[in-house]
Amino acid sequence: MNILEYENYQEKKSHVDASFPYNTLLCSIPLDFDKVPLHWHDEMEIIYIKKGHGYVTVDFKQYKVSGSTIVLILPGQLHSIEQYDNLSMEYENIIFNVNMLLPRTEDTSSTDFLRPLLSGQITVPSVFSVVSPHYEAISACIDACDEICKTKPVGYDLYIKGKLFEFFYILSNRCRNEKNPRTTKSLDKMKVILKYIETNYMHRITIAEVASSVEFSESHFMRYFKENMGTSFVDYLREYRLTMASRLLVVSDSTILSIAEEVGFDNLSNFNRAFKKHYGVTPSQYRKLTS
């Protein structure tokens, strides 16, 4: 199960209408995942913290967040969600395709803001706390969308689109930055690496293969990964596999051996040992505790 498969699972559980690309998911750390590993996708994401405390990382910058905080994830931005000091955090995950707001015939709303925002030519703040300027206006747009999604009356999709335009108006009129401080080249390399892991973690992966995917030597790749991720590639891959295994233990009836093989471990003893070292319990105990 990779990140995309997990999101699809959540969507099915939440009975999302696939015909309208605006998905609202209620999530919990660590109930759904002990962490959401660093990843990216083409949709925009809003992480709306409901209660608790945690960390959200956006393009390598980590933010400590708590109840009522709003985090904006632009299409293509690297992001992850983690626990803070073993505390739980409940949050709303809103994922939507910005393309549904783009006109077929270009106008100034798309050429002056939406497309430059999507391409990274301009930026907006990633995090809005209750004391941030314009927080109330931004949260009001999201709250209004949440409220109408409870009943979904005829035309609710038009209402949501209207609120999204209002949301982007606030960002464009009051929160935009013309210069993009992101180190795009470094981020693009890491996006390739993370997508490679997400696609291939269930198979044997060598450092040579991943280094080749970004045209690095093995030594340069290992140094680059450690500098940007704060851990070695081998340790990161092991933790990623264990995170996916923990979710499968909860949502599937597969045997522990099958799960170990599905997430890339070719030896059950090694899997059990690594899992207990990371989570403090065996896979069987973990499944019982979370059932």
Regions found by a protein language model. Give the residues of each.
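Short, conserved beta-strand element in jelly-roll/cupin
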Residues: H39-V56, L72
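Conserved short histidine dyad/triad with adjacent acidic residue
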Residues: T24-W40
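Short, Lys/Arg-enriched, Trp-marked, Pro/Gly-tolerant hinge/linker segments that flank
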Residues: V124-Y135, C149-H203, I207-V214, E227-E239
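Short acidic-glycine-tyrosine-enriched beta hairpin
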Residues: F60-P75
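Terminal helix-turn-helix DNA-binding modules in bacterial transcription factors
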Residues: K191-T199, R204-S217, R223-N272, K288-S291
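A hydrophobic/aromatic-rich effector-binding and dimerization subdomain
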Residues: N2-N23, L78, E82-E147
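Regular secondary-structure segments
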Residues: K50, I122, S139-K150, L194, ...
